């Protein structure tokens, strides 16, 4: 049977490892428990988390047990990694609700039945910690000098780093130790921005338990220009269909740049590598076949085959002019009374764009169309003349479509 390490390596997930040869040997001969942490700062996972979910799924398919840790405790502090400002603190109720939402989304590609995967909340052990005992047992193993060299703290030192956030690395290291003791968890995985925190946990277990522990980071999902993928004009690309519709989700992947198709097929689908190579070799107009496959496969994983098929049909209807299938396109319904209002007001009210200012910005940039006509007037008012048989068609940029139907 193929070693999952080789699968992860071939598909390009792996960025850094603590002990490469040991990890490869371990994954090939034993079934291990490993964990990935999720920071519950929102009530939905987004595309940035999707790559982590894929790694968990590949590992589970090879017989290893994923532990999904939600940071109900650390979430009350906030991870300073990659942040320029201190995060707003959330209530316990918010965090608990977000954790429940995460499990539902993770369960779409991770099997939680019969102890094949487990979800834990670090609030269970962090919230009742005795501070003096924690300092004596854990704090003694952390060098402040060494911590200050970590990338996650460097960028914050000039602007100000609170002692609250400085504790985050100790908390995350303690999470790994706790999971090692309770579940024999021997490996922590995470995005490459978590490397310093992962090293801290590996080192803590080796010091406290005199046992082997390992860490692995994987590449972040970036485009060919090095920018993080998953951002749209409306904000983040969420996995919750209420926040990002299956159609919008499908369209995002259908419209990725040609240069990003191969990477996306490798990292966020389960297509065999031979098929990935075949699709990635297509050129010219044929690359659209690869993009359609990518969009369908990714949407199917997150929203199910039925929703993926609906999104595909709606996208093809739009370009093929088949009006009867437009019902699968993101559609907002308004009353007749809502007409004769400024377009920017309606776009914000229908949540097609996050705000009026965003709508104005898009109009100024020449990126907004009504019924395929470019909008040049920021004060444009929609009237009955704009209502067609299919509703009012709104296009953002070249390929993002919405429909407004007047009831």
From Swiss-Prot:
Domain S4 RNA-binding: 341-405
Top-level division of the source organism's lineage: Bacteria
GO biological process, one term: tyrosyl-tRNA aminoacylation
Entries under CDD domains matching the protein: S4, TyrRS_core
GO MF annotation: an example: RNA binding
Protein name: Tyrosine--tRNA ligase
Residues the entry annotates as binding ATP: 231
Subunit structure: Homodimer.
Major subcellular location class: cytoplasm
Motif 'KMSKS' region per record, residues: 228-232
Organism: Clostridium botulinum (strain 657 / Type Ba4)
Short motif ('HIGH' region): ranges: 40-49
Subcellular location as annotated: Cytoplasm
Catalyzed chemical reaction(s): tRNA(Tyr) + L-tyrosine + ATP = L-tyrosyl-tRNA(Tyr) + AMP + diphosphate + H(+)
Entry GO terms, CC: cytosol
Coiled-coil residues: none
Swiss-Prot/TrEMBL keywords: Aminoacyl-tRNA synthetase, ATP-binding, Cytoplasm, Ligase, Nucleotide-binding, Protein biosynthesis, RNA-binding
């Amino acid at each position: 049977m193929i070693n999952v390490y080789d699968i992860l390596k071939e598909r390009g997930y792996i960025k850094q490892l603590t002990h490469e040869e040991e990890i490869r040997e371990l994954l090939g001969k034993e079934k291990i428990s490993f964990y990935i942490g999720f920071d519950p700062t929102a009530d939905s996972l987004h595309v940035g988390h999707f790559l982590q979910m894929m790694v968990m799924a590949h590992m589970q398919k090879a017989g290893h047990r994923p532990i999904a840790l939600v940071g109900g405790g650390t979430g009350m502090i906030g991870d300073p990694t990659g942040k320029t400002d201190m995060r707003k603190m959330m209530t316990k109720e918010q965090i608990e609700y977000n954790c429940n939402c995460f499990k539902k989304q993770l369960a779409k590609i991770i099997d939680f039945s019969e102890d094949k995967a487990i979800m834990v909340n670090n609030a269970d052990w962090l919230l009742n910690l005795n501070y003096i005992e924690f300092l004596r047992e854990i704090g003694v193993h952390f060098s402040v000098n060494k911590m200050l060299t970590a990338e996650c703290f460097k960028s914050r030192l000039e602007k100000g780093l609170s002692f609250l956030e400085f504790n985050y690395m100790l908390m995350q290291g303690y999470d790994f130790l706790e999971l090692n003791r309770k579940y024999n968890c021997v490996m922590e995985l995470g995005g490459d921005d978590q490397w310093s925190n992962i090293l801290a946990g590996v080192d803590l277990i080796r010091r406290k338990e005199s046992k082997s522990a390992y860490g692995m980071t994987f590449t972040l999902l970036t485009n060919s220009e090095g920018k993080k993928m998953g951002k749209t004009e409306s904000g983040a690309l969420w996995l919750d269909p209420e926040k990002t519709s299956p159609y919008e989700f499908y369209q995002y992947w259908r419209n990725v740049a040609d240069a990003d198709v191969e990477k996306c097929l490798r990292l966020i689908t389960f297509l065999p590598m031979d098929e990935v190579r075949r699709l990635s070799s297509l050129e010219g107009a044929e690359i659209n076949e690869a993009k359609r496959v990518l969009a369908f496969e990714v949407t199917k994983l997150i929203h199910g085959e039925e929703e993926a098929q609906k999104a595909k049909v709606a996208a093809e209807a739009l370009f093929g002019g088949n009006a009867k299938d437009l019902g699968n396109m993101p559609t907002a319904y308004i009353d007749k009374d809502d007409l004769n209002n400024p377009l920017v007001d309606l776009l914000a009210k229908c949540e097609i764009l996050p705000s009026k200012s965003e709508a104005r910005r898009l109009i100024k940039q020449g990126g907004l169309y009504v019924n395929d006509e470019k909008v040049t007037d920021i004060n444009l008012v929609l009237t009955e003349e704009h209502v067609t048989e299919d509703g009012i068609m709104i296009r953002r940029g070249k390929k993002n479509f919405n429909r407004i139907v007047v009831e």
